[in-house]
Amino acid sequence: WKEFRDKALINATSVIKSVKPEYIKDSTGKIEYALIQSDNPAIVSSVNTQQFRDLFKENFGSDLWVIIPNRSTILVMSADKNRLNTYKKAFYQMFLDAIYPVSREVFLINSKGLWAIGDLKTSF
């Protein structure tokens, strides 16, 4: 199992290095969230790596909220209820419209790990 895990982490790390997130901004130019889209479904495996957290720490802090509505999309934002409530209906629609849906859960990712903390259908 350890050998499999080590190889998976190496693969996930190489995948995250190949993506360029698109930063979605509000009308004042402030970053609201990041959008990652990739044809490589292995991109989803990168969310629990240090490199993933490092990629977003400067813009969103050390506590990230991550939504994975389908196998080719990852949404990342700071742990902010108001920001999530602004976009959760659109994010949930991405899940509903997906050919390959993954999850409607909101995940907290930080140095301690990854946890499902809620659902896009519930209030935060």
Stretches with model-predicted labels:
Residues 1-107, 120-121:
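A contiguous, surface-oriented mixed alpha/beta subdomain in the mid-to-C-terminal portion of proteins
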Residues 114-124:
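Short, low-order "capping/linker" segments at domain edges
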